[in-house]
Amino acid sequence: MTSQASAQAAGNTWPRLISALINGADLTADNTEWAMDTIMSGEATPSQIAGFLVALRSKGETVDEIAGLVEAMLAHANPVDIAGEKLDIVGTGGDQLNTVNISTMAALVCAGAGAKVVKHGNRASSSSSGSADVLEALGVRLDLPIERVARNAEEAGITFCFAQVFHPSFRHTAVPRRELAIPTAFNFLGPLTNPARVQASAVGVANERMAPLVAGVLAKRGSRGLVFRGSDGLDELTTTGPSTVWEIRNGEVTEQTFDPQALGIRAATVEELRGGDATANAAVVRDVLSGVAGPARDAVLLNAAAGLVAFDVDAEGTLTDRMAAALKRAEESIDSGAAAAVLEKWVALTRG
């Protein structure tokens, strides 16, 4: 029996689900898991996918609805087995601010500080340089067999799960997403569907309404970490002003405002964080890892500190206290050369 046939026997059909959404009813996680499984299996038409996404967005997604999408997407992913505690630092994109690759640099700094980082990302969609683009410009090969992706995490302390390699079934969404050309729930699934199933996440979300939902899904799935949104709309912890932070610990989500000036970080402007294409942004990565001071370094240190706070399950104290301690570790990672050494070893492993 196909997934369509078995689901119809259980009452799940596209007309039923889309009609419910149009009428303002929330779906269950089982409903959306069926929908995503059908999409990932190639059994949904572009019209059904588009209708579902638009109806879901118009009603407004819930934690359970997103959780169902995530469950099905992970079920269709190519798994990668990486032992131990793992961290992902990632932004959803979509802030339209075209900054340098802050989360990618922060990931390298966290690895230099001893965290095992499994970054999940893709090429740019709304900016000039996504994580995959800048890593390629730095010399990291992305077209690796899955076993080598896992080995890099063990030997270099960091690896990259290229979304299009690990989520091949997501190709079925390409046409309706391209033709809709609007943000949908699918724009927020990347940080929630790391195929290594990381235990800790530091996630930047530009969309103000979706940020607490992303935190809620992480909590529902038993993850820990931080979700944040800059007051300037940046999908990072911003240095231009305060950020809203949702912390996930022990299945609970707490919301607070975090001001980087409390850590002595100088206020920057968005223009000072502006990036370019992959080549230009790769040059910024090399500068930051070599110890060049300035707004880019400050933003990287702040977001690396967030990653280390997410990773360190045993740390105590207020968020500001834990961020201050983690900031010192991030500074040491750069200033000792450890972060740069991680990148050098990673490039060599992917090229060997």
UniProtKB/Swiss-Prot annotation:
Q: Which Pfam families match?
A: Glycos_trans_3N, Glycos_transf_3
**Binding-site positions, anthranilate 2:** 177
Enzyme class at the top of the EC tree: transferase
Q: Name one GO biological process term.
A: L-tryptophan biosynthetic process
Which of this chain's residues are annotated to bind anthranilate 1?
A: 91, 122
| Record-listed 5-phospho-alpha-D-ribose 1-diphosphate binding positions | 91, 94-95, 99, 101-104, 119-127, 131
The UniProt transmembrane annotation reads none
* Catalytic reactions on record: N-(5-phospho-beta-D-ribosyl)anthranilate + diphosphate = 5-phospho-alpha-D-ribose 1-diphosphate + anthranilate
Determine if Ribonucleoprotein is one of this entry's keywords.
no
InterPro entries with a match to the protein in the record: Anthranilate_Pribosyl_Tfrase, Glycosyl_Trfase_fam3, Glycosyl_Trfase_fam3_N_dom, Glycosyl_Trfase_fam3_N_dom_sf, Nuc_phospho_transferase
Q: What pathway does the UniProt record associate with this protein?
A: Amino-acid biosynthesis; L-tryptophan biosynthesis; L-tryptophan from chorismate: step 2/5
Which keywords are on file for this protein?
Amino-acid biosynthesis, Aromatic amino acid biosynthesis, Glycosyltransferase, Magnesium, Metal-binding, Transferase, Tryptophan biosynthesis
Query: What GO annotations for molecular function exist for this entry?
Result: anthranilate phosphoribosyltransferase activity; magnesium ion binding
Q: Which residues bind Mg(2+) 1?
A: 103, 236
Which cofactors does this gene product need? Mg(2+)
Entry note: cofactor: Binds 2 magnesium ions per monomer.
Q: Where does Mg(2+) 2 bind?
A: 235-236
**What EC numbers are recorded for this enzyme?**
2.4.2.18
Q: Which GO terms describe its cellular component?
A: cytosol
- Tell me its family: Belongs to the anthranilate phosphoribosyltransferase family.
Function (record text): Catalyzes the transfer of the phosphoribosyl group of 5-phosphorylribose-1-pyrophosphate (PRPP) to anthranilate to yield N-(5'-phosphoribosyl)-anthranilate (PRA).
**Description of how the protein assembles with itself and partners:** Homodimer.
Q: What name does this protein carry?
A: Anthranilate phosphoribosyltransferase
Q: What organism is recorded for this protein? A: Arthrobacter sp. (strain FB24)
